[in-house]
Amino acid sequence: MEVVQVLPKDNYNVFVYFVDGKIKEYNVSHLVGKGVFSKLNDLDFYINNCTVLNGTLAWTLDGKYDKYNCIDIDPYTIYENGIEVEDPLVHIA
């Protein structure tokens, strides 16, 4: 299962687009402040560093989008636990 695009929202929800065309809304608030995810406490960091690395939802730690210097979430976790939604970008015109 591979992630191809992400769209973070300021409520710690992220729209996660998968290669099979499904879109899942996944809330990461349960991770914020815990271990490696403590950086997500900073909402600006959370939004501005949210990206796709290693085929999944990730946050670059150095701004260089290095696949080894990031925090990420297993795409299967997102796929199984996220809520399937319609593309939120369809409604923006």
Task: Show which residues each predicted segment covers.
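Motif-centric detector for short Cys/His coordination patterns
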Residues: 1-93
